[in-house]
Amino acid sequence: MNKLFRLILIFLSALIVITFNFNGSASQLDFDDGIDRFITSQMKTHNIPGLALAITHNNQVLHVKGYSAANNDHPVTAQTQFLIASVSKSFTAIAVMQLVEARQIDLDSPVQAYLPEFALTDPSFAQQPPGEIDAKVTIRHLLNQVSGLSDVGFPELQLSQATTIGERVTSLSQARPVELPGAQFHYFNPNYEVLARVVEVVSQQPFSDYLQTHIFTPLQMSRTLNATTRADASQGATNMAQGHLMAFGLPFAYPEMSGYLSGSGGIVSTAEDMANYLIFQTNSGQFQETKLFSESSVVLMHTPPKAISSSYGMGWFKGSENGETAIEHNGILSTFYTDVVLLPKEKYGIALLYNINASPLISMAFPQIKTGLIQLLKDGQPAVGGFSVTLWGIAIALLMFISVTLAIRSLLYLPQWRQSIHRTPLWRVWLGIGFTFLPAFFLLILPWIFALVSDRFFGHVLLFRSMLDLMLWLSVCAVLGVVNGIARLIFLARSNRLDAVS
């Protein structure tokens, strides 16, 4: 009887274990299926050619997978490599904080204590002796993006691109501060590029080697690397995603721009590797048995300075998603986009790596996908709806057709306009001619308008890449407007109205 009883207990225990595992597996399958349905639906709605996704909770990977459109010739997997752009800044901040904990860097020491060659163009507003401003910029200022430097005083994307970290530091001798150090937040890529050079000098290792030894290898990020330039990224990556641009809601493959990246945007990674990074970030700086630095350093990196109005910590923005504190950062290149968000309260982490970028996607699609995933994690159901980038493309195409039609109609009306010159007040004639040149004038000054609004300077090439359909529409309007305006000026010059005025 005792033997039979023991056999029954063993059978029931095994049944409970099997049932538990089955329910767990079924639950995981339901979760994965829900994620898959949501992502594929969003990709179809917004014509996204490919993305890779990693979701973690506590010290577990919940989901890691690559997704591709049906007609994609370069299928995306969890091992596909992406340029993660400005998400790289948090890795640079980790390197600095490791050296701070090793007492090799002092956050409040001047940058010049480590890089004597660090020098800026002294601004006239400061009314201080030459060399005073750059001598006051500290390591903490660079990390918090409050160095006083900005794209307005140093439009680095429009200048000759450095090929080494040392060249980037010396190129800042042309940079004009726009604020005193510590006074105000200005997002400025070279802040983190200077920090990369500080890491090199203090550690006596090339920056890429330092990251590999002290961050990538301990976190088992085997397919992750740091590139100094875009060309280095292509040479170093063995499975790089094909980047894309978008026009009128339609994606097309296009090479990424060349340029300098290291320190601010040079890391190449995969969804699989980023899952390990998310676990490290949401677990107080620990991954499995590896602890890269203290919990206090993680908290400091995630916390904006209190002395000024800023949401930027050290490589991270602090915000909110669905009413909950979120630590996040995106990464933007012309053909790649990355979204990383940490929910510290519940220890969730999400990394989205896209092989496409365009302003409509940044404004509409990418936020919808990020928010939908967060809602799916918290409520089990993502939000639906939102404006489709495909509809946006149709709307812009229609707007372009209407604009071109009206411009051609105006050109065809020129003979009648010429005859009406004598019956129209001269000021109205000049006003009408001036209006024809407005699109061209607006197109010319657009980079400075963006700089005024966003504190970032993007030249015409970058603007064309980021919003190709809008820029094409504006360019066509500008060309037709200039042709119209020149024709009217010629007609006016040949009339006797100008002779009468003179």
Predicted regions located by residue number:
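Catalytic tyrosine of NAD(P)H-dependent dehydrogenase/reductases that use a Tyr as the general acid/base
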Residues: 82-85, 185-187
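Catalytic-site signature segments of enzymes, centered on catalytic residues
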Residues: 129-130, 151-233, 239-245, 249-275
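Catalytic loop of the DD-peptidase/beta-lactamase superfamily, centered on the K-T-G motif
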Residues: 26-51, 55-57, 255-502
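Short, conserved catalytic-motif segment at the N-terminal edge
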Residues: 28-84, 120-131, 173-175
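Stable alpha-helical elements in mature extracytoplasmic
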Residues: 31, 35, 47, 51, ...
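Hydrophobic secretory-pathway targeting helix
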Residues: 2-27
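Short glycine/serine- and small hydrophobic-enriched flexible loop segments
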Residues: 97-101, 196-201, 276-283
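Active-site helix/loop module of the DD-peptidase/beta-lactamase fold
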Residues: 50, 83-87, 99-150, 174, ...
